[in-house]
UniProtKB/Swiss-Prot annotation:
UniProt keyword annotations, A-Z: Acyltransferase, Transferase
Name the record gives this protein: Octanoyl-[GcvH]:protein N-octanoyltransferase
Known pathway: Protein modification; protein lipoylation via endogenous pathway; protein N(6)-(lipoyl)lysine from octanoyl-[acyl-carrier-protein]
Gene name as annotated: lipL
Family annotation (PROSITE patterns): BPL_LPL_CATALYTIC
Pfam family of the protein (one): LplA-B_cat
Gene Ontology annotations of biological process type: lipoate biosynthetic process; protein modification process
Organism, scientific name: Macrococcus caseolyticus (strain JCSC5402)
Keyword Transferase in annotation: yes
Role this protein plays: Catalyzes the amidotransfer (transamidation) of the octanoyl moiety from octanoyl-GcvH to the lipoyl domain of the E2 subunit of lipoate-dependent enzymes.
Swiss-Prot/TrEMBL site (Lowers pKa of active site Cys) positions: K153
UniProt EC number: 2.3.1.204
Active site as annotated: C141 (acyl-thioester intermediate)
Source organism superkingdom: Bacteria
Length: 274
């Protein structure tokens, strides 16, 4: 990749504190809409503590209510997101990054994933570890652009397109235990499936195939440090970063997308707070 989409003006939006998960996905849709209309590209960071973000397929689990009850008993809330197909674990040690830029139907899905892969490689280049993009089949939310080191997954990427804008979203497991997060999801699927055969194949999770970056890099690493690595990498790849305030028109548009998220989740009657 040439890094060409990184060259030029980007708005940096720091949402690492103070938001609920449904707000995050609503903001990404709003920024997609605006970027599609010609606004500057956006890089947005977000952190949510103790919540499982379920995918569309998870909403069809035969014993979803029991699975949600298990998560709640473990101190985790749950919501259904508007991108991606399966559940992921978020907590204070997981940094989410959204790259939001303009793109039409000719812009391939893989190209969007490659840009995020390029960015993450730049962020952690100094550690000298090879980061691979390939499916880790026994991880939670497996996909062809799972990011791993030595076969252990630390990140997953999803993509959403709204009104001519593209949001490529990644979760980076930075601090803590990757295998403990994976074990939470393994138990969730065990409870929510109860061994039933379904048309959709849910992941058969092996907790040992997931790890955090501080485990894989064998060094102490914090979300705050990685935020600085992100901004430095964006500038290295050619981005000019700025911060802009929300306007009244932006809030109006945001509220439209937020209402859609509320409607999607209200049908499930699940505990979002844990």
């Amino acid at each position: 990749m040439t890094g060409s989409i990184f060259e030029g003006k980007w708005q940096y939006v720091d949402h690492t504190t103070g938001l609920q998960p449904m707000q995050s996905f609503s903001f990404d849709d709003m920024y997609c809409h605006l970027v599609g209309q010609g606004n500057d590209a956006v890089v947005r960071t977000w952190v949510h503590n103790h919540v499982v973000i379920l995918g569309i397929h998870d909403a069809r689990l035969p014993y979803l209510a029991e699975g949600i009850e298990y998560l709640n008993n473990k101190g985790y809330g749950a919501i259904v997101r508007n991108s991606g197909g399966l559940g992921v674990v978020l907590d204070a040690g997981v940094l989410n990054i959204s790259l939001i830029f303009k793109g039409d139907i000719s812009f391939s899905i893989d190209a969007g994933y490659e840009y995020m892969y390029e960015l993450v490689q730049e962020m952690f280049a100094s550690y000298g570890k090879r980061i691979e993009a390939k499916e880790i089949t026994r991880s939670y939310c497996p996909g062809s652009y799972d990011l791993s080191i030595d076969g252990k997954k630390f990140a997953g990427i999803s993509q959403r397109r709204v009104k001519g804008g593209i949001a490529v979203q990644i979760y980076l497991c930075i601090e803590g235990s990757g295998s403990e997060r994976a074990e939470l999801m393994r138990q969730f699927y065990d409870i929510a499936l109860r061994g039933e055969v379904t048309k959709f194949h849910y992941p058969d999770i092996d907790s040992s195939c997931m790890a955090s970056l501080e485990e894989l890099l064998e060094t102490e690493l914090s979300v705050e440090e990685v935020l600085f690595k992100l901004l430095f990498a964006m500038k290295t790849l050619g981005a000019t970063l700025s911060n802009n305030e929300m306007t009244n028109d932006m809030w109006t548009l945001y509220n439209i997308y937020f209402e859609r998220m509320i409607e999607r989740n209200s049908k499930l009657k699940i505990n979002q707070e844990g």
